[in-house]
Amino acid sequence: MKDEGGDAVSAINTLVGTSFNINTRKPKIYNVFGGLSGPAIKPIALAKVLEIKRKVDIPIIGIGGIMNWKDIIEFMIVGASAIQIGTLNFIDPTAPAKMISDLENYCIENNIQKISELTGSFILPN
């Protein structure tokens, strides 16, 4: 990817989903298909970031279901250099700013000098 000019990659965004009313048999979503996002996609997003990290050597922006500072740490451990928050901003636009102090406290408690030390620090089972 880097050889082709890619400076970074983001993963993932909303997944396509649908839902139907069992009584009317009509879609609950006017356009039939809609976006599935938020905490429901976090495990998929984490797996994709880890998969990408194992294949490329460029920064990865982790996206998908980040609702608290622990989610940020988890995305960084699997390889994200940065994160993007979507759904949470609709719930509480001030939440991302509040997470910074929690991240700082985590780093202090775990003797982490720079948060970037977390990026790709996963330990896989033998």
Q: At which residue positions do the language-model features occur?
A:
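A short, charged, Gly/Pro-tolerant segment at domain boundaries
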Residues: 117-126
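Short Gly/Pro-enriched loop/turn and capping motifs at secondary-structure junctions
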Residues: 66-68, 90-91
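Residue-level recognition of conserved structural "scaffold" positions that shape functional pockets
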Residues: 71-72, 93, 118
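C-terminal helical cap(s) of enzyme catalytic domains, especially alpha/beta-barrels
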Residues: 20-34, 76, 88-113
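Generic secondary-structure signature for well-ordered alpha-helical cores
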Residues: 3, 7, 54-57, 101-112, ...
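Alpha/beta enzyme core
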Residues: 1-61, 67-85
